[in-house]
Amino acid sequence: MVEYEAPLRDYEFLFNEVFDVTPTMERLGYDFDEDFLSMLAEGWADHAKEVWLPINQIGDRVGLNFENGEITMPQEFKDAYNQAIEGGWLSTSTKPEHGGMGTPIFFQSVIWGEIATSTNMAMSVLPALTLGVYDVLNEHGDQTLIDYFSTHLAQGHWAGTMCLTEPHAGTDLGIISSKAIPQDDGTYRVTGTKIFITYGEHDMTENIVHLVLAKTPGSPEGTKGITMFLVPKYLPVDLESGDLAGASHDLMENHNGVTCAGSEEKMGIHASPTCVMNFDNSVGWRVGDLHTGMKLMFQMMNQERLATGIMGLGLAEIAYQNSLAWAKDRRQGRDLKGPKDPNETADNILVHPDVRRMLLESKVNNEGCRALAAWTGILLDQMHSDDPEEAEYASSLVALFTPIVKAHFTDVACETASTCMQVMGGAGYCTEYGVEQFYRDVRISKIWEGTNGVQALDLAGRKITQNMGKNLRHLMWPLTEFIEENRNIPEMSEFNKPLHQGVRGLQQLTLLMIAEGQANPHFLAAGATDYCRYFGNVLLAYMWAKIAKTASKKKGDPFYDAKIASARFFFKRIFPETVSLAAKIQSGHKSVMEFPTEMF
């Protein structure tokens, strides 16, 4: 039986104590306080545990059914999804005028996202994608589209997807062949095939709204010629009047030429459809200006990249909780220094140093990533500040953090899920205990929304030099300020000194990557993944130093003492990885690129 308890105490600690979020949210205009956050988080945690978690293994074992171009989801999934709609749990951060709660973005992106993924990753993807479509539409769509589609999307009655990839065009979207032909009434006729479309077809909602990248006649070559179009599965228009808001008949009678040609068989997330979608002269509406499709889609994609990082964290957390429960219950052997439970036939396996190491690595990485997720979530809200300086500062940090959250979180999550299987031995490999499903499900997170190698290239090749290096300078301000503030505090020395060394190392490696990368792009590309990992570790080091500083004010309380001990483990056993990462980056590209191709 899979166990799960949402880390509600950790959320309270991070948002209320480490980051003291209430004054920021009040300044941004939210009707918000600590009690409201706790009530909302507890309510969602209870719902997800009671409704979503029990059907997670059903989704894995039963999966979906694809027949005659239609996908039928497990009935349990449809029932659970509708319960979430009724409870308002799919519309927490959407606008009140569209039926949403209007909560701060950080609740939906961090707290909702982690709990949803822990309890049912396959289910969680659908509302995450729908929210992305809703946000892009409300920022860039014309008012007619916003007025008609937003409420349906915000409340979860209609679902959303993003359609980028084609059989011949994956990372290189500039060569897509999907076409959009303008019509006299202002609509477009969209034709093309898209692949790997998550939730492209299903029966969970009344309608599916696709954001499709396509090219219009005479468009420039490459990505500069791409435009975004909104293409619904069913046309919500009155066919006689052509009035978008005048639909008065059954949507099922008004199919829009959007069909599913296949559903991929996958390693994990079996109840999350991955579709081949055909658009055959389908009616669509342009979103944004002509030839701005890539810019608009990257807004949604960056949102989904952050969501994917949180998904990794969610699965790593539930994997850790279940392996910890197993370790406490499983008795094998004795402590090397003598029995801990002499009245039992054996000690539980938590006495063994290697088991403790594995569990501590899992716990500490999870909690460090959660702290960085919390900071990033708050920045997402600050991006919408009326203060231009605050908005610019937040935007630059979110741009910098996005590839790190996506890549570092999911790299670590896959390692954690594998480690948690190892803690459980043979039981971890068996389907009965659930952890092997978490590993299969989380593995896609390193591939989704741009592989982690692409994220590393984005960080090293673009984000650190973007805006004349402003992104990185904005990060260095709080880091160097924290280091200076704690330089002469003895109890912070064990955390502050290695953090300082890590930050200095990051600065030096960044200069090296820029200088050598300009001379030879192979240098930058060969070191990008290690640089991203190094950067991620430095950010987690900053989080753990802040956590230790906050917890030191309440020593003697087991919760806070555990935070300090966890910070100590991070700096002693995880952060030293940066030394080897730096050595690999500094070694350059020659051992990679000069290896003869014919010898592979």
Task: Indicate where each model-derived feature is located.
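A structural-propensity feature for long, helix-poor, extended segments
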Residues: 132-133, 142-145, 149, 449-451, ...
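Alpha-helix capping/hinge segments and adjacent helical runs
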Residues: 2-5, 182, 189, 269, ...
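Glycine-rich cofactor-pocket loops
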Residues: 25, 29-32, 61-73, 293-307, ...
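A short core secondary-structure module
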Residues: 187, 191-252
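A glycine-rich, basic-preceded beta-loop-alpha segment at the flavin cofactor/substrate interface
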Residues: 196-198, 237-261, 266, 273-304, ...
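Amphipathic, small/basic residue-rich leader segments at the start of a protein or domain
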Residues: 1-123, 148, 381, 590-600
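C-terminal amphipathic alpha-helical interaction region
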Residues: 466, 482-600
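Internal maturation/activation junctions in enzymes
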Residues: 64, 77, 111, 126-130, ...
